[in-house]
Amino acid sequence: MTLEDRIESLPDACRTALALRLLRMALPIWDGHTQGHPVRYRDSVVAMEHRIAPDMLARTIDAIERHIRAPWFLRWLSLRIGLMRLATEFDDPIVSLQDLDMEWPEPVKLTFYAAHNLLEHSIKGGHTYDGHRLVYVSINQAADALERGGIMETHELDMLVRET
């Protein structure tokens, strides 16, 4: 059974919980890269300087966890105030990564993308253009970041998925 098949067999709440767990485990990769300082970069379109807050990924994880725990009748407020505001913080950096305006080590980039995809999943659910669930993509990216960053090996990930 492939990783995707195993993850697809889980209920949605378990998939999201697994994605959050892996992303929290990968957070030291991001923190090691930022070392508590904003990431600065210049975009190639208008040569404007941008900053990424060093706590952006931690705030994203916390906001998603708060959103999940919120009573159903308050989730729309959580969505509007917390998650959608965070999503706008990802817009410019995602474009700049795709335009190669900034180059990060692969584990850092994967951790950043995993946070973005989990946030998008939490806001609107859905799939990628090639049919993968956004939450699966986030899990896969976080797991890849953990492996490439030397934090977790494949067999440990398999055990973690089985425990979920």
Where are these regions (language model features)?
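Structured binding/interaction patches within domain cores
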Residues: 1-164
